[in-house]
Amino acid sequence: MASITLKGNPINTSSNLPEVGTKAPDFLLTTTDLDVHSLTNYKGSKVVLNIFPSIDTGTCAQSVRTFNQEASELENTKVLCISRDLPFAQGRFCGAEGLKNVVNLSDFKDGSFGKAYGLNIVDGPLEGLHSRCVIVLDENGIVKYTEQVGEIVDEPNYKAALEALQDA
């Protein structure tokens, strides 16, 4: 269990993020077109998992915008933006913002992604949503970098994630 904060108030996650050097757990997540994708859909590409509570918050929206901008410069890399939002909300946001360099995926059906990755919030006002995390995977799905953002209203360390991607 990781202890994080929401505006200074302590909250907890269901477990810890996967360890660097381990194989990332597979997942089944829903696209904005209501297709189902798994990690194997991205095999052979480096992957950035940008995970957040809801696309409808300012910090979460900014993380998607920032990674969308960075993704346009990245070779052989997919940026997956993952939340418990309905796929329709994710699609609406990216459509309105003109964001085309990231893939939005939803864990709305059963939360199994959050459970497998240890990042479900288990108490406090955001209970049941994902905590803010970034995980970088190499082309074989091996975890190369993780960040569990300590204060949920803060943005992730984009620079560190992008540097880890260079080494993946």
Predicted regions and their residues:
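Chalcogenol-based redox active-site neighborhoods
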Residues: 1-168
